[in-house]
């Protein structure tokens, strides 16, 4: 069983342009360039924009289960032209969110790092102890190793668009999904993501997998 964690309180950015009633709402804080460089478009937004066979995000933000991960739901929607979609971090920074207090086999974090890799410190806070896991998240242009069972593509080979919704690169960008093994015998309370100075981090979604 998979639980989609509610991270709405920490969202602070809108990197995906959406289309609602033939109105294109552009992204406002993007995925690179410190939030000023580029963003993504939904498929409907890209087609409305005149892009041919665009490597865009799907209109449905629910990514289906596959061999690498369970269902993961992102926070963009073509029916929502107002609310934030991600939590973006630049420089040395951190974020924290509570989870439903249960026992989990694993947690999944949807992330992108641009401007190079990001060194992350994932803090799992249980009722009785704390576990820290150090992770190097590669740049979102990097190809992932199929042998790495803890890092997979959530969205693969994406184009990116400038601040006027003009396509700047046609493919090769990813949203990665990090799997963190949890202690299935302990109740998890919260997750903290701490980031070192290098890289620009976009946090898209989180979910927990119960036994």
Give the predicted meaning of each segment.
Residues 1-211:
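N-terminal/edge-of-domain interface segments
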């Amino acid at each position: 069983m998979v639980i989609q964690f509610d991270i709405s309180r920490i969202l602070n950015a809108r990197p995906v342009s959406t289309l609602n009633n033939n109105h294109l709402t552009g992204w406002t804080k993007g995925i690179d360039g410190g939030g000023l460089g580029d963003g993504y478009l939904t498929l409907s937004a890209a087609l409305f924009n005149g892009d041919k066979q665009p490597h865009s995000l799907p209109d449905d933000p629910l990514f289906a289960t596959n061999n690498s991960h369970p269902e993961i739901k992102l926070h963009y929607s073509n029916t929502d032209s107002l609310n934030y979609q991600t939590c973006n971090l630049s420089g040395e920074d951190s974020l924290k969110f509570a989870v439903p207090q249960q026992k989990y086999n694993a947690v999944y974090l949807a992330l992108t790092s641009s401007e190079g890799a990001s060194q992350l410190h994932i803090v799992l806070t249980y009722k009785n102890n704390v576990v820290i896991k150090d992770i190097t998240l590669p740049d979102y242009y990097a190809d992932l190793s199929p042998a790495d069972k803890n890092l997979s593509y959530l969205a693969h080979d994406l184009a990116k668009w400038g601040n006027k919704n003009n396509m700047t690169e046609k493919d090769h960008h990813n949203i990665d999904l990090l799997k963190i093994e949890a202690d299935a015998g302990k109740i998890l309370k919260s997750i903290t993501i701490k980031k070192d100075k290098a890289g620009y981090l976009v946090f898209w979604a989180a979910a927990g997998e119960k036994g």
